[in-house]
Each structure stands twice: as structure tokens, then as C-alpha cells.
Amino acid sequence: MFAIQSENYFVDNYSVSDLMMYPCVELNVEAAPTATTRSSEKSKRSRTAFSSLQLIELEREFHLNKYLARTRRIEISQRLALTERQVKIWFQNRRMKLKKSTNRKGAIGALTTSIPLSSQSSEDLQKDDQIVERLLRYANTNVETAPLRQVDHGVLEEGQITPPYQSYDYLHEFSPEPMALPQLPFNEFDANWASSWLGLEPTIPIAENVIEHNTQDQPMIQNFCWDSNSSSASSSDILDVDYDFIQNLLNF
């Protein structure tokens, strides 16, 4: 019992003695934040205010090179009357700004492309379907009602009308065949052809059926062969015939 009371008494005395012996502890605790704020104010750097000319030059250099070497950074700082650290920080901030803008644009593009086609109203979809059905019906009816043209083979043989897939005989159309002339056999040859064509009197009488049918089968070379032994044709007769023929030509 007494031990417990003594312990309680000791605790009470200790707590009271601490409060009485160290009365300035609270003052030190209150003074500590003021010292830290003063040190932070001293360490806080001032914000750099760039002029319009400096910003234009920095932006121009950023579009050319987003990352500067130290030699180039020193040149820019000397030309714009800035410190090397200011130029370095400005480029860092500018790169972060560009990165944020590109990420934002990419997010907006992803949202626009991710919109499903089902977002359209059902009425618009029905209208589109109806238009497609009408077009299909119109196309089918035109195909069915169009009659198939039957090509006349007789006309095609003459070379007047030809389908596009068939070869066209231009030579046959534009250069027709020569006019056929009647060909008379040798036995029916008119001996007085000059008199009939030129209007002259016949000099040699026409003998009918002079050449027999059996001689037609023989070659024509035998008719033109000259028989040296035959004396049927004399030189005087030949000269008379030739003279009369030449005289008729001269009179014409």
C-alpha cells in the first residue's frame, strides 16, 4: 500500500518538477519555426523575368535544337545577357511544356477515335439502311429488265457490225475484192476481138465448132507448136492477113 503511494507521489513530484524547472522550453519551440522560415526565404531564388527579345531568341533556338551543348548554351547566354543556368532551366521547362502538350493532344485523339459507331442514333442507321436497300433494288431491276441483244451472225460475217471483243477485218471492208471478169476458155476466144471492140469489120470469118471437144483435153502447148514439115500455111497467106489487120488499125 505504502509503496504504491510512494510511486504515485514520485510521479507527481517528477511531473511538477519538470514544469517548474524548465519553464523556457515552450519559448524555444515557438522560436524554431521562425528561424526555418527566415532561412527558406533567404534560400528561395527570385523568378527570372525574360524580355520579349530574349523569349523570341530562346524560342527560335528551341525549334532548331531542343537540347543544347554547353558551348552553345554559353554563346546564347552571352548574347542575351543571361546566365548559363537561366538558359539551362528555361530549356528544361520548355521541354516539359512540349511533352505535356503532346500527351494532351494524344489523349484527345485517343478519345475521339475510341468513340464507337453505336453512338449514332438508331434513326440515322435506319435511314442509311433504307437508302442502301433502295439502291440495291434499283440496280437489280435495271439488270433484269435490260434485254440481251442477240447478234446476227449473218451480219457479222459480212464485216459490217462486230462486237468489241471480236477482231475486225478492216482490210476486207475498206479494200473490197476486185470485180470478177468473165474468163473465157481458149477454144471460145473470139478471133475478131479487135473488130468487136473497136468497131472494125471482121477480117477473119468466125468458124463455129472448129475445135472438137476431144482437143480441149489436150494441152495448149500443142496448138502453139510450129510444125516445120507442114505446108498448110504459106508465107503469102500470113502476109495478107497481117497486112489487112494493119490496114484496119491505120484506118481507125
UniProtKB/Swiss-Prot annotation:
<comment type="function">
    <text>Required for the differentiation of the dorsal-ventral pattern, and does not appear to be involved in the process of segmentation.</text>
</comment>
<dbReference type="GO" id="GO:0000981">
    <property type="term" value="F:DNA-binding transcription factor activity, RNA polymerase II-specific"/>
</dbReference>
<feature type="DNA-binding region" description="Homeobox">
    <location>
        <begin position="43"/>
        <end position="102"/>
    </location>
</feature>
<keyword id="KW-0804">Transcription</keyword>
<dbReference type="GO" id="GO:0005634">
    <property type="term" value="C:nucleus"/>
</dbReference>
<dbReference type="GO" id="GO:0006357">
    <property type="term" value="P:regulation of transcription by RNA polymerase II"/>
</dbReference>
<dbReference type="Pfam" id="PF00046">
    <property type="entry name" value="Homeodomain"/>
</dbReference>
<dbReference type="InterPro" id="IPR001356">
    <property type="entry name" value="HD"/>
</dbReference>
<dbReference type="InterPro" id="IPR009057">
    <property type="entry name" value="Homeodomain-like_sf"/>
</dbReference>
<keyword id="KW-0805">Transcription regulation</keyword>
<keyword id="KW-0371">Homeobox</keyword>
<dbReference type="GO" id="GO:0000978">
    <property type="term" value="F:RNA polymerase II cis-regulatory region sequence-specific DNA binding"/>
</dbReference>
<keyword id="KW-0238">DNA-binding</keyword>
<keyword id="KW-0217">Developmental protein</keyword>
<dbReference type="InterPro" id="IPR017970">
    <property type="entry name" value="Homeobox_CS"/>
</dbReference>
<dbReference type="InterPro" id="IPR020479">
    <property type="entry name" value="HD_metazoa"/>
</dbReference>
<dbReference type="GO" id="GO:0045944">
    <property type="term" value="P:positive regulation of transcription by RNA polymerase II"/>
</dbReference>
<keyword id="KW-0539">Nucleus</keyword>
<protein>
    <recommendedName>
        <fullName>Protein zerknuellt 2</fullName>
    </recommendedName>
</protein>
